[in-house]
Amino acid sequence: MSDLLVVPDAERVAATVVAGFRDVVDFPQPGVVFKDITPLLADARAFATVVEALAALARASGASAVAGIEARGFMLAAPAAERAGLGFWPVRKAGKLPAPVLRREYALEYGTAALELSAGTVGAGERVLVVDDVLATGGTARAACELLEEAGAQVVALAVLLELAPLGGRPRLGDRPVVALHTQT
């Protein structure tokens, strides 16, 4: 499947991603370099470029929905889902949804956390494209994919704006296809 998922005009999209990120050193804690997408979101043309690329991936993958990982994944997945004519499934941080919920705990590069999904959101066998801004260690993305699979979905791919390859996130996702609009090596 991942060989079939090609970003149209990939070089231009990758350049847009690179130009739209800003590094914030020692945030949220010392030793972490936070990848801030605020400049990309503030630039209407850049934002439209990445949203259209994600929508194209959703259409090409045969997804029936797009899931966004809180919080920055929401900003990308919701408009991409709308543009592709698909539903949007929010994968939330723990404690943000009313019961009943499905829950998955995971490790971050700077701590631990949990993700939740409203029970009943996903129909058995539905195909979902999972979207987030950055793939770093893969903990958050893996937890989101496992949560969606537990709910009955088939994850067709994980799509991210930026993959930080040296942090080794892709192998932690197993056989799930990963599409990065730009990979930092």
From Swiss-Prot:
UniProtKB keywords: Cytoplasm, Glycosyltransferase, Purine salvage, Transferase
GO biological process: adenine salvage; AMP salvage; purine ribonucleoside salvage
Coiled coil: none
Compartments reported by the entry: Cytoplasm
Disulfide bonds: none
Keyword Cytoplasm appears in the UniProt entry: yes
Gene3D superfamilies associated with the record: 3.40.50.2020
Pfam families: Pribosyltran
SUPFAM superfamilies: PRTase-like (SSF53271)
Superkingdom field: Bacteria
EC number: 2.4.2.7
GO MF terms, alphabetically ordered: adenine binding; adenine phosphoribosyltransferase activity; AMP binding
Catalytic activity, reaction form: AMP + diphosphate = 5-phospho-alpha-D-ribose 1-diphosphate + adenine
Listed pathway(s): Purine metabolism; AMP biosynthesis via salvage pathway; AMP from adenine: step 1/1
One GO CC term on file: cytoplasm
Assembly mode: Homodimer.
Function: Catalyzes a salvage reaction resulting in the formation of AMP, that is energically less costly than de novo synthesis.
Similarity comment text for this entry: Belongs to the purine/pyrimidine phosphoribosyltransferase family.
Protein's name according to its UniProt entry: Adenine phosphoribosyltransferase
Organism encoding this protein: Kineococcus radiotolerans (strain ATCC BAA-149 / DSM 14245 / SRS30216)
